[in-house]
């Protein structure tokens, strides 16, 4: 069971301010959520094969087919800085 102290700790971890009224409301909401989990714990799953997703998805990405791309000159055309055919970026240290 979630208490006001738990909500205060969670809000501290999340770096958010929660009013007293909101704390009480959050206690009720968290406990309702935990009650739902308790109901799920009571479901008989004997003989049910574990699954990671309920929808059978196939690879939704496009085929990896080689195709023409920009030339080096086209890629570097709008680069603010370049050196020896490469993009030049400021030092980041």
Swiss-Prot record:
Reaction it catalyzes: L-glutamyl-tRNA(Gln) + L-glutamine + ATP + H2O = L-glutaminyl-tRNA(Gln) + L-glutamate + ADP + phosphate + H(+); L-aspartyl-tRNA(Asn) + L-glutamine + ATP + H2O = L-asparaginyl-tRNA(Asn) + L-glutamate + ADP + phosphate + 2 H(+)
Class of enzymatic activity (EC top level): ligase
EC numbers: 6.3.5.-
Single GO MF annotation: ATP binding
Keyword tRNA-binding: no
A Pfam family annotated for this UniProt entry: GatC
Gene Ontology biological process terms, A to Z: glutaminyl-tRNAGln biosynthesis via transamidation; regulation of translational fidelity; translation
Gene3D superfamilies: Glu-tRNAGln amidotransferase C subunit, N-terminal domain
Keywords: ATP-binding, Ligase, Nucleotide-binding, Protein biosynthesis
Disulfide bonds: none
Regions annotated as coiled coil: none
Protein family: Belongs to the GatC family.
Task performed by this protein: Allows the formation of correctly charged Asn-tRNA(Asn) or Gln-tRNA(Gln) through the transamidation of misacylated Asp-tRNA(Asn) or Glu-tRNA(Gln) in organisms which lack either or both of asparaginyl-tRNA or glutaminyl-tRNA synthetases. The reaction takes place in the presence of glutamine and ATP through an activated phospho-Asp-tRNA(Asn) or phospho-Glu-tRNA(Gln).
Subunit field text: Heterotrimer of A, B and C subunits.
Name recorded for this polypeptide: Aspartyl/glutamyl-tRNA(Asn/Gln) amidotransferase subunit C
């Amino acid at each position: 069971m979630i208490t006001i102290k738990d909500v205060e700790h969670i809000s501290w971890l999340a770096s958010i301010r929660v009013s007293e009224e909101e704390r009480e409301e959050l206690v009720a909401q968290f406990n309702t959520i935990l009650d739902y989990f308790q109901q799920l714990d009571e479901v008989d799953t004997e003989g049910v094969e574990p699954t990671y997703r309920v929808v059978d998805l196939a690879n939704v990405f496009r085929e990896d087919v080689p195709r023409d791309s920009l030339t080096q000159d086209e890629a570097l055309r709008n680069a603010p800085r370049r050196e020896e055919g490469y993009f030049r970026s400021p030092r980041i240290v």
